[in-house]
Amino acid sequence: LRRFARFCIDNGADIVYGHGPHVVRCVEMYKDRFIAYSLGNFCTPYAISIMGLSGYAPVIVVRTDRRGRFLDGRIHPFIQRKGLGPRRDTTGVVVRQIRMLTDTDVNGGGLRISDDGAVVPVEKE
């Protein structure tokens, strides 16, 4: 998945939003472009479990410059509730999960994720 997402950037994509495993995964900046490896499911039918990680349903909005370089973004955290659909996560668990996965899986991914969901590039020193 990581190789494919980077292949997409290498071949002209400005943003990659991955999907598939029904759970959130890490995010990263690669060559000044934003990659979200998976945002889980936003609205799941009754046949699929929405317990725990399977219920996390973030929406990530990103801003780029005219050349497609990532400027900043925001995670809008939602959690699915059976029979009710997605509801805003007021506990912070969704943002914390994405930050933890990003720190663990891609060593921070060149991004800083704040508690309020703001996503900014780590300044190069």
Where are these regions (language model features)?
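Conserved beta-sheet core of the metallophosphoesterase superfamily
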Residues: 1-58
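A short C-terminal boundary segment appended to hydrolase-like catalytic domains
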Residues: 51-125
